[in-house]
């Protein structure tokens, strides 16, 4: 998530490449790392927590109460914002990009969230290039989510460094 970037692919085509804001690490609310599948999608949702009640136009949960959604209240995305003014774990996305993803994603779509330098079991791999330069299907092979989810679309967020290199959900 250090790159604060998300890429969204459908049928092998890159549809979205955007900066995002992920979970607030200074408050111990960092976004989850792993391979997930989209639960469902919903418009005009109200996200609720102990200290907030926030309406969003596009809600796409993939890990408990964590998901991808628009963040109309933000004027900036990317950089180090997540360290002090990040989300409660969700992937805050610019409105137009959240809309594009919403219109093209289906329940069961794999979502890959990672930090640069994450150990994936085969040594440490720093992913600093967009997913189209890697074989994402090979990375998903063998996971429970991948075997039950469709492979038409892949949402990915990258939380590596603020150099703008990745957004599969990092």
Q: At which residue positions do the language-model features occur?
A:
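N-terminal post-signal-peptidase region of extra-cytosolic proteins
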Residues: 19-25, 40-49
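Cell wall/extracellular polymer interaction/catalysis modules
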Residues: 1-28
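Exported/periplasmic cell-wall-interacting domains
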Residues: 30-35, 42-170
